């Protein structure tokens, strides 16, 4: 019973938090204050991928260890093919 009440309160809190932090498209980024300004800047960074700091990371060179699980097109290797080591692209 207590766990159910806690879960209901948590869901209501998270729902309210979603509505409070939602960005109003009628407001421009210059009128945003506090948390709204922070969320607006984060959303603008996702729209403009060149502004993202995640794009600044480098890639792993060919024949270097890239991970345990083999995933094709993982983006970790410069050649985009990782099978325990970065595999160079076929000519």
Curated annotation (Swiss-Prot):
Primary localisation category: secreted
UniProt keyword Oxidoreductase present: no
SS bonds (residue pairs): 59-78, 66-82, 77-86
Gene Ontology MF term list: ion channel inhibitor activity; toxin activity
Keywords: Disulfide bond, Knottin, Neurotoxin, Secreted, Signal, Toxin
Annotated signal peptide: 1-22
Cell division keyword on record: no
Propeptide, chain numbering: 23-57
Localization: Secreted
Tissue: Expressed by the venom duct.
GO cellular component: extracellular region
Record text about domains: The presence of a 'disulfide through disulfide knot' structurally defines this protein as a knottin. The cysteine framework is VI/VII (C-C-CC-C-C).
Family: Belongs to the conotoxin O1 superfamily.
Name this polypeptide is given: Conotoxin VnMKLT1-021
Phylogenetic classification of the source organism: Eukaryota, Metazoa, Spiralia, Lophotrochozoa, Mollusca
């Amino acid at each position: 019973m207590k766990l159910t009440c806690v879960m209901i309160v948590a869901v209501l809190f998270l729902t309210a938090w979603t509505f409070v932090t939602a960005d109003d498209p009628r407001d421009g980024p210059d009128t945003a204050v506090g948390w709204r300004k922070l969320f607006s800047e984060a959303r603008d960074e996702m729209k403009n991928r060149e502004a993202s700091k995640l794009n600044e990371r480098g890639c792993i060179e060919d024949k270097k260890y890239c991970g345990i699980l083999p995933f094709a097109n993982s983006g970790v290797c410069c050649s985009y093919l990782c099978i325990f080591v970065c595999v160079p692209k076929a000519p």
